[in-house]
Amino acid sequence: MQDMRLQGLYGISESGWYKRPHEAIELLLEAIEGGMKIFQLREKEGSDEEILPLARALWNHCRQKGVLFILNDRLDLALSLGVDGVHLGIDDAEASRARILLPHGIIGISCYGDLDRAHKAKEEGASYVAFGSCFPSPTKPASSVIDLTLFKKAQEELAIPLCAIGGIEAQNVGELIHCDMIAVISSLWSGGVAQVRKNAKGLIQSWRENRERV
């Protein structure tokens, strides 16, 4: 059975938030007010000890607001905090190991443009899979851009929530009609605290309008 919470705007933090925790909390709260339903703390630098204070604070805010909180990669930290789940990439722990450690948690797996990897992830217990980069991405400029028809095929074959990621902005999000979540970084946080709520609402509105036409 699909987790019905896995839908909507999925915000992913920019790198280095743990170095500016007060701003990070403000950004998170503004995104939530704008309609963000899922948040992922993604910190590829810094130790678990350095990230722990911010992770705990953001998790508490998400819990109070009814927003899902996902940690990127850091499975041990996710277990110690008791957050909603983890997101794993190609170099992270396998979904099967994560499912053993998080029997009731959300496990997301990056599948890039690989449908076979998505099938394997589902078999190993993934809650959702992510495909991308959907468009050229300023966060990962070297990433290959996938064929968006992959989403329709995955929707037909997988029967688990699908997340689109990579280069998504208000001007192109309308092309993503066969996914459950849109994961964004740059287009959500650009402009800082004063702009985030507007960014979130704009992304959601553009996506919703185009999906309703289909």
Curated annotation (Swiss-Prot):
Q: Which GO terms describe its biological process?
A: thiamine biosynthetic process; thiamine diphosphate biosynthetic process
Say which enzyme class the record assigns: transferase
Q: Which reaction does it catalyse?
A: 2-[(2R,5Z)-2-carboxy-4-methylthiazol-5(2H)-ylidene]ethyl phosphate + 4-amino-2-methyl-5-(diphosphooxymethyl)pyrimidine + 2 H(+) = thiamine phosphate + CO2 + diphosphate; 2-(2-carboxy-4-methylthiazol-5-yl)ethyl phosphate + 4-amino-2-methyl-5-(diphosphooxymethyl)pyrimidine + 2 H(+) = thiamine phosphate + CO2 + diphosphate; 4-methyl-5-(2-phosphooxyethyl)-thiazole + 4-amino-2-methyl-5-(diphosphooxymethyl)pyrimidine + H(+) = thiamine phosphate + diphosphate
Q: In which domain of life is the source organism classified?
A: Bacteria
Its pathway, per UniProt, is: Cofactor biosynthesis; thiamine diphosphate biosynthesis; thiamine phosphate from 4-amino-2-methyl-5-diphosphomethylpyrimidine and 4-methyl-5-(2-phosphoethyl)-thiazole: step 1/1
Q: Which residues bind 4-amino-2-methyl-5-(diphosphooxymethyl)pyrimidine?
A: 40-44, 72, 110, 140
- Single annotated GO MF: magnesium ion binding
Q: Which cofactor does it need?
A: Mg(2+)
Q: Supply the name of the protein.
A: Thiamine-phosphate synthase
Binding residues for 2-[(2R,5Z)-2-carboxy-4-methylthiazol-5(2H)-ylidene]ethyl phosphate, per the UniProt record? Answer: 137-139, 167, 185-186
Q: How is the cofactor bound?
A: Binds 1 Mg(2+) ion per subunit.
Q: Which SUPFAM superfamilies match?
A: Thiamin phosphate synthase
